[in-house]
């Protein structure tokens, strides 16, 4: 999951894949997966 989001937004969600992944999931799909 983290790799998918990292591939989408490497500029913003790369330094913190876990936390950013969680936020990205919540904002985009509405589900937090860390």
Curated annotation (Swiss-Prot):
One of its GO terms (molecular function) is toxin activity. Signal peptide: none annotated. There is a cross-link at residues 11-17 (Cyclopeptide (Ser-Pro)). This is Cycloamanide E proprotein. It comes from Amanita phalloides. Processed by the macrocyclase-peptidase enzyme POPB to yield a cyclic decapeptide. POPB first removes 10 residues from the N-terminus. Conformational trapping of the remaining peptide forces the enzyme to release this intermediate rather than proceed to macrocyclization. The enzyme rebinds the remaining peptide in a different conformation and catalyzes macrocyclization of the N-terminal 7 residues. Keywords: Toxin. Cyclic heptapeptide that belongs to the MSDIN-like toxin family responsible for a large number of food poisoning cases and deaths. Cycloaminide E is structurally related to other cycloamanides that are non-toxic to mammals but show immunosuppressive activity. Residues 1-10, 18-34 form a propeptide. Belongs to the MSDIN fungal toxin family.
């Amino acid at each position: 999951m983290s790799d998918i989001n990292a591939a989408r937004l490497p500029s913003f969600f790369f330094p913190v894949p876990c936390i950013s992944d969680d936020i990205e999931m919540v904002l985009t799909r509405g589900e937090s997966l860390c």
